[in-house]
């Protein structure tokens, strides 16, 4: 046996050992959905590193039981997809809960699109809302136009202050009052689409243009968009939209084609449902996990606590 044969044998042994190690590691993985529900405050306490996140988002636990909390501001936008009843709205509830429990309305404001009219009744008079929960397509289209103008206004204001982004602007050490109404700080804005398909069906081209324009430029302005949908065809999730939504979160899909639409890979069709997800941040590897769950009672308590602490919402004066 010459040296080449020995090297080949060693490589084969190393490969076999790696496979065994992976199988042993897989034995400790979370391989079935935990239907009892995982309270976000229990599985991913927002302390330490997560408290330094601009926009903390509790996803859940990964395959090995490790809590998974990400910073939405770093994604900077997210596409959420999966079949009906597989965990998308519960996931968005977790996002909102994490934001309102750690950030004040001066730090983050929310815009929520709820075409079903019933998914976000629990939000009520949440002080973090920048506008009342939006339930009509025409109103959401107007809100997107307003958001586009707000983005441009912020970027011009940042440039005038010699700042490249919202972090630089809010972190200015010395601020001289220019007398032009420039605020000391501005809040992040998180826009949540609970079901994007309805809007694309009625106002497809303009919505695609606006959302693509905003997502392409809004990171510096502190505006972040989360698009969720159960309709995963090319008329709803277009190539232009996908290119500007680098964060991907897939719940169980009907087919491998739907899986590829969300995460550019197969696998979501084999998930169990009930919050079982695959997550990819930009070009990183897929991470499987079990989504966080917060009960309606807990959500109501969070809203009541926010109202008690910050008062009633101060909506923007956006006129149609």
Name each model feature, range by range.
Residues 171-183, 214:
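Conserved alpha-helical scaffold flanking the Walker A/P-loop in AAA+ ATPase domains
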Residues 1-28, 33-164, 183-253, 257-271, ...:
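P-loop NTPase catalytic phosphate-binding loop
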Residues 314-317:
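Intrinsically disordered, low-complexity mixed-charge segments
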């Amino acid at each position: 046996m010459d040296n080449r044969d020995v090297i080949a044998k060693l490589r084969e042994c190393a490969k076999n050992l790696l496979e065994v190690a992976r199988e042993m590691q897989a034995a400790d993985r979370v391989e079935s959905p935990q239907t009892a529900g995982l309270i976000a405050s229990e599985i991913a306490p927002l302390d330490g590193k997560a408290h330094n996140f601009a926009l903390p988002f509790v996803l859940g636990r990964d395959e090995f039981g490790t809590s998974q909390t990400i910073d939405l501001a770093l994604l900077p936008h997210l596409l959420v997809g999966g079949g009906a009843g597989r965990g998308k709205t519960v996931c968005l509830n977790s996002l909102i809960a994490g934001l309102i429990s750690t950030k004040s309305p001066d730090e983050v404001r929310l815009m929520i699109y709820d075409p079903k009219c019933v998914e976000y009744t629990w939000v009520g008079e949440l002080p973090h809302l920048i506008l009342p929960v939006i339930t009509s397509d025409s109103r959401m289209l107007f809100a997107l136009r307003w958001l586009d103008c707000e983005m441009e206004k912020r970027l011009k204001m940042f440039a005038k202050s010699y700042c490249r982004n919202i972090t630089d602007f809010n972190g200015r050490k010395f601020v001289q009052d220019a007398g032009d109404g420039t605020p000391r700080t501005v809040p992040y804005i998180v826009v949540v689409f609970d079901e994007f398909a309805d809007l694309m069906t009625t106002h497809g081209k303009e919505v695609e243009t606006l959302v693509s324009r905003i997502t392409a430029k809004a990171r510096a302005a502190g505006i972040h968009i989360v698009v969720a949908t159960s309709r995963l065809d090319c008329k709803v999730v277009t190539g232009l939209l996908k290119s500007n939504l680098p964060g991907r979160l897939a719940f169980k899909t009907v087919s491998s084609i739907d899986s590829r639409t969300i995460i550019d890979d197969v696998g979501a069709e084999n998930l169990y449902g009930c919050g079982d997800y695959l997550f990819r941040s930009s070009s990183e590897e897929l991470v499987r996990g079990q989504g966080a769950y917060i009960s309606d009672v807990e959500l109501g308590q969070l809203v009541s606590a926010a109202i008690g602490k910050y008062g009633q919402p101060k909506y923007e004066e956006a006129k149609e």
